[in-house]
Amino acid sequence: MTVKNETIDYSKTLYLPQTNFPMRGRLPQKELELIARWDNMGLYAQLRQQAKDRPLYILHDGPPYANGHIHIGHALNKVLKDVIIRSFQMRGFNANYVPGWDCHGLPIEWKIEEKYRAQGKNKDDVPLNEFRQECREFAKYWITVQSEEFKRLGVVGDFNSPYTTMAFHAEARIASELMKFAMSGQIYRGSKPVMWSVVERTALAEAEIEYHDYESEVIWVKFPVLQADSSDLCGAYVVIWTTTPWTIPGNRAVSYSSQISYGVYEVASTQNDFGPQVGERLLFADALAMSCAEKAKLVLKRLRIISADELKTLFLFHPLKGFAGSYNDKIAMLDGAHVTENAGTGFVHTAPSHGREDFEIWNAYKPLLEQFGIDSSIPFPVDDAGFYTKDAPGFGPNREGGAVRVIDDNGKMGDANKEVINALIKADRLFARGRLKHSYPHSWRSKKPVIFRNTPQWFISMDKDLGDGSTLRSRALEAVSMTRFVPSSGQSRLASMIADRPDWVLSRQRAWGVPICIFANEDGVILKDERVNERILRAFEAEGADAWFAEGARERFLGERAHESWVQVLDILDVWFDSGASHSFVLEDRDDLKWPADVYFEGSDQHRGWFQSSLLESCGTRACSPYKAVITHGFTLDENGKKMSKSLGNTVVPQEIIKTSGADIFRLWVMTTDYWEDQRLGKQILQTNMDLYRKLRNAIRWMLGILAHDEGEKISYCALPDLEKFILHQLFELDQLINRAYDEFDFKKIMRALLDFSITELSAFYFDIRKDSLYCDAPSSKKRKASLQVIREIFERMVIWLAPMLPFTMEEAWLEHSPKSHSVHLEQFRSVPGEWQNGFLAERWRKVRQVRKVVTGALEFERAAKRIGSSLEAAPIVFISNPVLLEALENLDMAEICITSALTITQDVPPSDAFILSDVEGVGVYPGKALGTKCARSWRYTQDVGSDPAYPDVSARDAAALRELQMLGKI
């Protein structure tokens, strides 16, 4: 039967892609629809049910603070965690993600206090537990807000039952962990210089400190020699340098280093009528003497060397000796390893009330100091409001006009520096003065400078013998050595921080937090009574930590011991202890989790924060780490590599990206970064990722469209054409790379590999070659069916591989492909048949593609010269003198592979004008024009067009396809 070919619309006889999967994602709208779908179907519950018998994989969530909307760092962190959770869930694990929130602490207190100030209320007039309840409600509100923001990012987890540090059970467990430290003797009340925020009226941990440039007043001070073995030192001065003049009233010693060369110098001349005068003898480190002379505008003459042995015998007067009738103690010289000759004078003013190293060297020399008749107690020269106390005579409350202030409530320096310097000038003890811009500690909340001040606080000892020969420090260092770190540099970073850190300051003088729920006597001895502890824990479990502050709490908890002289401690715990104890009340106490966690994953700043507090808390109570691995990410900078800041106007708000572009665009950006380093983000970078997304989406869309014609016929591997086997080999290698990279948390490697595969290997190579067969071959074509089978494998594996990274787009694509499926996220990564691995074919096709590259280059040259339009207009002659390449082309249809209508291969010598590429030796191409007639259906030029009289304008292949389609009733 013949058909009049003029009645046929050939475009309707082709197997062209057909899909409802749109080219434009409309992600902001589509993602909301998918979130609603997941909620309605109970996706999280289905994931848990499906995986209940699999081995657990636990990523323990480092809790963000329940205050304000999420920022770009939160979004980055949660997306990375989500990819880990999803990838392990889809690779045979039960990866349950339980989000958490840190709820206690000063920032929330500040918010409530701000509200009070706006209402004209005084916080001190509000009952403590009423204030705490307002803090609790504030945190609860922001947990709800942040939960929705995290879910909008595509994060899947147990948002209906998250953990919070303010839950009654959590507060009870935090208290229980504290009691373990107390009962084992690791907690003590001490007097130590701590970083103190006058603005916030509390001690700060190292993790609560950030460093900013700050301009300080600096002074060089002369300490007169009181006692020396050499007569030439009587009347001489030891000169120190300090950036904190206000600490001079707290001076108790001068430190030097036995590793530094020192000398005795004489003032030879001076430009000043005040300060050091000609003939004065001064002691300096030799390396620093001349720079000090320049500061004082004088000339020094070196008289002699002074040895460390001689220095240690010296005793000095305090530079304020006699001021306000005080400062009459003698000042010892102490040999300290912390002294350097990098700056200053080589002598260090030592005030054990105002510095960690000063405190440590003072305590190390305590027995010797007492032998010298020096009072070794450490004074409290500054109070919590930044005023001098009675321990700073002449500057404290007995001073006419009242106590001088070091720093005020706004974080501004008071008059202390000025008053101390004036006193030194009057005593003729000022050598020189100046100003210095340097890095100085500030509170991370108030952004105001802090001071070191000696305060009574509660501490966890880092170096107490724990009964087995170990200390908390040694246990933690051992645990670090056994932990996996990504990147590996994190291990040495955390280890060095632990090795150098001081004892852990537990106490805070605030209101919103878990109390240090212990009783102690006036000497700081802690009550160790299990019955008292049990009463406290039962109350916390039922009522929360507010029970500690309720009226009658002391009598309630002490019970029959209430008549004894135990004092209830009212300080609250460092919030890092709260989150550091989360492994106990989350990992240990939930049936759906396990202890220890497989991984903790946070920003690199958490080496001094949550990673460290969790490690110390666990090592102190369990002698080992609560995690097996630690992964860190860097910080997000703007497009120019600058820190994001509201004042600079360069912040990127994740909610805006989601609103305008979609969460998957943000997630794609995360997946293309080296997240363990600092990343950059801005409009141009987002645009680049949107372009990548479009290419990826178009490849998926094309596969969906062509698979609309897939009838699911299965062809054995042996029967597949070589090209399909080669593509399956690439899938095999991709599978190996992707699984390995997911294990290594190298998401950029996965995304880059899949983007390259999609754009270079599929769209620009395999799909391009097979489009003619897929569109034009007959329904019964084995080649077409083989290609459809391989594309099905590609599509399903790619979508599953990408699902953890781009959960919205891959869900949309999967549901288009398998409408009856519940969700791609319920799928598992599929095993790859070993027979797909074929190194021989891979090498063969590497050679084939070298030849193809030369042919393609020649055709591009012809197209640019407008000698051809489509590559189908060409019938190139390929000259191959390389026998290895020639052998690789045997039995291959190179015209199809190069997408030309014909192609001739010859071993003849190529003409001089043949097209060549320098990196492919032995191949030349002469781009001849295709002979024959253009097929109206496939657009190929062949000499058999019209060979079937029923279809005079199509090739024999296309005519046969049309006959088969007609026979099947498809046209």
Swiss-Prot record:
A motif ('KMSKS' region) lies at residues 643-647. Keywords: Aminoacyl-tRNA synthetase, ATP-binding, Cytoplasm, Ligase, Nucleotide-binding, Protein biosynthesis. InterPro entries: aa-tRNA-synth_I_CS (IPR001412), aa-tRNA-synth_Ia (IPR002300), Anticodon_Ile_BEm (IPR033708), Ile-tRNA-ligase (IPR002301), Ile-tRNA-ligase_type1 (IPR023585), Ile-tRNA_ligase (IPR050081), M/V/L/I-tRNA-synth_anticd-bd (IPR013155), Rossmann-like_a/b/a_fold (IPR014729). It is found in: Cytoplasm. Its main location: cytoplasm. L-isoleucyl-5'-AMP binds at residue 602. Transmembrane segments: none annotated. It catalyses: tRNA(Ile) + L-isoleucine + ATP = L-isoleucyl-tRNA(Ile) + AMP + diphosphate. GO terms for molecular function: aminoacyl-tRNA deacylase activity; ATP binding; isoleucine-tRNA ligase activity; tRNA binding. GO terms for cellular component: cytosol. ATP binds at residue 646. A motif ('HIGH' region) lies at residues 64-74. Gene3D superfamilies: 1.10.730.20, HUPs, Valyl/Leucyl/Isoleucyl-tRNA synthetase, editing domain. The keyword Ribosomal protein does not apply. Belongs to the class-I aminoacyl-tRNA synthetase family. IleS type 1 subfamily. HAMAP family: Ile_tRNA_synth_type1 (MF_02002). Catalyzes the attachment of isoleucine to tRNA(Ile). As IleRS can inadvertently accommodate and process structurally similar amino acids such as valine, to avoid such errors it has two additional distinct tRNA(Ile)-dependent editing activities. One activity is designated as 'pretransfer' editing and involves the hydrolysis of activated Val-AMP. The other activity is designated 'posttransfer' editing and involves deacylation of mischarged Val-tRNA(Ile). This is Isoleucine--tRNA ligase.
